[in-house]
């Protein structure tokens, strides 16, 4: 009998975001958690390394912190749309967020399990920013979403709003979202 759910994997950038908690699904099976490190490249590498290790994998869940100017600190959000906010080839005639010569859509769309979060856009980039143009911003979700989109894996992303672009707020709130996330995961 499998003591963990082989069809679901949680990816989080840092152990501090999860407090090293063990997450259980609705059948009380452990959902494995892997840590990607910060940023798009680290997230991509970790996702690609994890994929062959879990042959029954159907869903990747990303949990982490995010900044927002319009969603209050302390709220857990299910993101549904992902854009690469720092891809800027506009001088070459490309739209902001669109990778030149890449057939992947500019905005990757997935379903959310949280009601009323169907149009939340997460802007992912390798920089901390205070001028937030999207519903929220992070540093990993788009990278993980793109790997999932390419390989046909379901992708769910939950972001805990830790700050409004202020690094000091982030440091204070980095671990505060784990209990809200744990409640959601226990229903999957």
Residue ranges of model-derived segments:
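A short acidic-Thr-Gly-centered motif at the start of a beta-strand
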Residues: 1-2, 130
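Extreme N-terminal starter segment of soluble prokaryotic enzymes
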Residues: 2-9, 31
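Short polar catalytic/cofactor-binding loops
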Residues: 12-17
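Glycine-rich phosphate- or other oxyanion-binding loops that anchor nucleotides, phosphorylated ligands
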Residues: 19-188
